[in-house]
């Protein structure tokens, strides 16, 4: 069974959350978000690579530019949406669930997770099974290898963080 909630979707990998199912959510995300860049990232679950590759292939087939952050913490994808002014993001993760599970979390232009209303609109698009034809022009994938570093540097520079590096001995 695929579980849908305000947290996104979750399911046993390759039983309920397959690359084919994931690309249906990618199609719906493409249709829901305005034109622009989508940030993608994943956790370190072994199944994440197949799922995110299916998503990226589908989004670029539909003409999207995808900034692919690779294996990153979920908040880093949110930060990159904010930092790059992307139109949204997608994270392949099942959070606290066992390794045989995986899931999809969705991020809006404001760099926060989708609201209940946004999730319901996305689920309706998936259920409608709209087959979107290829875009006139293929999208591209930009690998982002420094997303975590950019996120850490931005956090360390916040005025509310008292970072005393003199305490660190290497």
Language-model segment annotations:
Residues 25-38, 160-164:
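Glycine-rich phosphate/diphosphate-binding loops that line cofactor/substrate pockets in enzymes
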Residues 12, 104-167:
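Gly/Ser/Thr-enriched, mixed-charge loops and adjacent short helices
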Residues 30, 36-109:
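Ferredoxin-reductase
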Residues 5, 17-21, 25, 51, ...:
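General structural feature for long, well-ordered alpha-helical segments within catalytic domains
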Residues 11, 26-30, 58, 89, ...:
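Glycine-centered structural positions embedded in regular secondary structure
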Residues 1-17:
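N-terminal amphipathic/basic leader segments beginning at the initiator methionine
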Residues 28-32, 80, 157-158, 170:
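A generic secondary-structure signal
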Residues 2, 168-170:
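Conserved small/polar residues in nucleotide/adenosyl-binding loops
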